[in-house]
UniProtKB/Swiss-Prot annotation:
<keyword id="KW-0106">Calcium</keyword>
<protein>
    <recommendedName>
        <fullName>Translationally-controlled tumor protein homolog</fullName>
    </recommendedName>
</protein>
<dbReference type="InterPro" id="IPR034737">
    <property type="entry name" value="TCTP"/>
</dbReference>
<comment type="similarity">
    <text>Belongs to the TCTP family.</text>
</comment>
<comment type="function">
    <text>Involved in calcium binding and microtubule stabilization.</text>
</comment>
<dbReference type="Pfam" id="PF00838">
    <property type="entry name" value="TCTP"/>
</dbReference>
<dbReference type="InterPro" id="IPR018103">
    <property type="entry name" value="Translation_control_tumour_CS"/>
</dbReference>
<dbReference type="GO" id="GO:0005509">
    <property type="term" value="F:calcium ion binding"/>
</dbReference>
<dbReference type="InterPro" id="IPR011057">
    <property type="entry name" value="Mss4-like_sf"/>
</dbReference>
<dbReference type="InterPro" id="IPR018105">
    <property type="entry name" value="Translational_control_tumour_p"/>
</dbReference>
<dbReference type="GO" id="GO:0005737">
    <property type="term" value="C:cytoplasm"/>
</dbReference>
<feature type="domain" description="TCTP">
    <location>
        <begin position="1"/>
        <end position="171"/>
    </location>
</feature>
<keyword id="KW-0963">Cytoplasm</keyword>
<dbReference type="InterPro" id="IPR011323">
    <property type="entry name" value="Mss4/transl-control_tumour"/>
</dbReference>
Amino acid sequence: MKIWKDVFTGDEMFSDTYKVKLVDDVMYEVYGKHVSRTLGDVQLDGANPSAEEAEEGTESATESGVDIVLNHRLVETGFSDKKQFTTYLKDYMKKLVTRLEEKSPGEVEVFKTNINKVMKDLLGRFKDLQFFTGESMDCEGLIAMLEYRDIDGESVPVLLCFKHGLEEEKF
């Protein structure tokens, strides 16, 4: 199993249990789904719920949302306007370029070329994006973006993360 973590905060952002696609060698697209589940409910494969005794007087709470967000404890954040988002992107890209120059100098030019196209595209879709930090809620780290796409007539949540802001860990 692979888990992608924020290089600056160490927060888990997503894993390979989802469909992951790399776009322009700079952006991961992670395809999730909307789920509802009971809090504290552990479901075991092969268990027969009808054979279990019903517990009386217990109330169960449910949570619903995008599975990637819930499973990796991402926290929604926001930008007041496109200008604030642009400022974040510029500052974050400077941090990534500095890190790339230290760790992978050969990737800097490809990154700079491809990221400009991706950033322009993101800014054009600003109103359609939701924003999430990792569990630590450190806004100095990666802020993932979430959008909904129509795929085969279904609204599918897609989490967008900058490749160079992540490190891959194998378990």
